[in-house]
């Protein structure tokens, strides 16, 4: 009984360890790779999307309800700290919060109803 338990434990450890193989190295994106902003508007009104970073405010465009807008962030806005996205509808606005971006990443900005439920995530 003790031997079977030891063999079972050893087998499980070998199985778990085989999943820890070497990962392929991913090289960083070139410094001139664009940063894409993908905005999905789940809100009930058209939203104007603005990016603010490095003391620059840049209007990206308008995304209508139920639509997806894809934009490219100007290179001058990257590297000097964080970037924040805002979606504005008159007096109401959604914000992404500060995002630390690097060349080649994609930002998914989901505008939700109510606006304080909006989210942003960064992916490679």
Language-model features and meaning:
Residues 1-8:
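Bacterial N-terminal signal peptides that target proteins for export
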Residues 15-19:
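C-terminal motif of bacterial Sec signal peptides marking the signal peptidase cleavage site
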Residues 21-28, 93-124:
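Extracellular beta-sheet/turn segments enriched in Thr/Pro/Gly and aliphatic residues
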Residues 39-43:
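Asparagine-centered strand-capping/turn motif at beta-strand->loop junctions
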Residues 45-49, 81-83:
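Short beta-strand/loop motifs in extracellular/secreted proteins, especially
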Residues 50-57:
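Short amphipathic beta-strand segments in non-cytosolic proteins
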Residues 68-76:
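Exposed aromatic-hydrophobic patches
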Residues 78-90:
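A short, solvent-exposed beta-strand micro-motif common in secreted/extracellular proteins
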